[in-house]
Amino acid sequence: KCAIHSQAGSILHIPREGGYLCRVYVDLGVVPEDDNHKVRNTPIEKIIEKANEIYAPYFVDVKMVAWHSVYEVGHRLVDAFDDNDDDPRVFLTGDACHTHSAKAGQGMNVSMQDGFNIGWKLGHVLDGRAPKELLSTYHGERQPAAQNLINFDREWSTLMATPTEELDDPEAVEKYYVAAEEFAAGMMTQYEDNLIVGTTQHQDLATGFPVGKRFKSFEVLRRCDAYPQHLGHQHTADGRYRIYAFADAPKAGETSKLSEWAEKVGPILAKFTPEGADENTYFDVKAIYQQTDHHEYEILDAPLLFRPRNGKFNIPNWENVFNALPGDKDIFHTRGISRDGAVVIVRPDQYVGAVLPLDDPAAVEDYFSSALIKLT
């Protein structure tokens, strides 16, 4: 996107598909209190005229307007995203919950996150894998996220509407946008402790994966074919939890915390898995070894937990074992992962649910005992 700020006002450009379309937000200025919404009837010719005042001494010769509208910025937030704290039956998402300006480009992004959040939770409850209490986490997670968006948008839209001569710093708009880049990218939301968000007690084991925030991906090397992959890109929207087991120093085939953890966690996960279903039906468990040379061990040396058998023909999945890359691409270094190992549980919506020690497999059962229903 491109933000233009001049003495005549501000404009926000967002390029569109096809190579010739462009969405343009034109600030029409302060609306008088007695306007009675007449500004909403502003003709397109007046909008183009105002745009060129802002562009001056440059101008744009508009060839075609595919669609336009005029709206007044209103910052509003509902009191609740559901109808009942104990047993909710009605859920609100998106614009039904929060309204704000379009200048941050966050409306659709945040609304889709609302929908994804309640969507996977409904799916888990309706198919019997999670307790109905899971639904109560929707309001607790998304209402504060919407409030943070409105706070951000109020500050951003006010800054964009402030005449340049009134700004303390002529580069204030640019500096604020750069500083808020991570928020605009959707990576700043952080959920508080609840049924599916653990405490930060062991956060020091993986400082680059903050509990309650989006899983921030990084490249690793897939062992089966020595192909570099972004770890987070293996997380498809299939309703499963991801469990990333970052190994301690020994390589696969040697006695280690990871091998002992895998031996004990396999039976734990089986307690939540339907009888007769593939062992990775509800969980996708991946190992990431510290060794940067994939020739140092054979994939068959990795514990069976990371080589689950799937489908009608009981075929092993070879794509769950990874190595760190060398040098400054080492995920252990870049994401602050302890060389003693760590376990990172990621929810179906790609938010980090827990960071746990590798030498405490029982902590995995504790986490999922709240998130899921034990079947055996």
In which residue ranges do the predicted regions lie?
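FAD/FMN-dependent oxidoreductases across multiple families
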Residues: 40-106, 110, 145, 149-153, ...
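Conserved FAD-binding catalytic core of PHBH/FMO-like flavoproteins
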Residues: 1-73
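Functional cores that coordinate and move charged inorganic groups
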Residues: 97, 108-123
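Generic beta-strand/beta-sheet core signal
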Residues: 25-27, 68, 93, 246, ...
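Structural scaffold positions in well-ordered secondary structure
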Residues: 65, 95, 115-118, 138
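Short, histidine-centered active-site or binding-site loop motifs used for metal coordination
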Residues: 26-30, 96-97, 103, 247, ...
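Short, cationic motifs built from Arg/Lys/His that form the positively charged side of catalytic pockets
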Residues: 21-23, 86-89, 94, 98, ...
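Helical substrate-recognition/capping region of FAD-dependent monooxygenase/halogenase enzymes
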Residues: 15-17, 31-33, 49-54, 86, ...
